[in-house]
């Protein structure tokens, strides 16, 4: 990108730092040509090329239905401080559940250090499940004055 109004392409280390500083975004899913975006908390593991998240599911979860039918997900993470100061990162790839027994203790500890808490409203049973987004494509653009 050469036009400064459209920002600059971020380097890999800038993207990783931004993802782990923000640690929240919108996970975009699709089912029968319908899109569904959900706010999530995550931790980005550059060495493993993945974003890890601990998702909550209610009994009749629309989220689960969409996850089961989505081949490729998209995670959008952004910060907007003004028209001339913003950052946007998109992570796309396959999405799969991770058995909690397969997660090493240091990975879950790291997740809880990096990811931001999102409280789930009381009043129903919520089942927590680990998922990972395999980062097959990662891009970031930023504009600073």
Give the location of each predicted region:
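Structural motif
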Residues: 48-50, 72, 94, 137
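Charged, gly/pro-rich active-site loop segments
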Residues: 83-145
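Short, solvent-exposed aromatic-acidic interface loops
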Residues: 56-61, 111-115
């Amino acid at each position: 990108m050469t036009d400064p109004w459209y920002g600059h392409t971020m380097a890999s280390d800038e993207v990783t730092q931004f993802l782990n500083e923000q640690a929240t975004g919108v996970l975009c899913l699709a089912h029968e040509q319908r899109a569904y975006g959900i706010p999530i908390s995550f931790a980005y593991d550059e060495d493993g090329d993945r974003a890890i998240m601990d998702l909550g599911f209610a009994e009749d979860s629309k989220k689960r239905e969409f996850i089961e039918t989505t081949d490729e997900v998209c995670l959008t993470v952004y910060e907007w401080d003004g028209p001339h100061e913003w950052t946007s990162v998109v992570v796309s790839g396959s999405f799969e559940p991770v058995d909690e027994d397969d997660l090493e203790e240091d990975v879950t500890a790291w997740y809880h250090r990096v990811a931001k808490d999102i409280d789930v409203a009381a009043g129903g049973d919520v089942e927590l499940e680990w998922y990972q987004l395999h980062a097959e494509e990662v891009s970031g653009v930023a504009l600073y004055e």
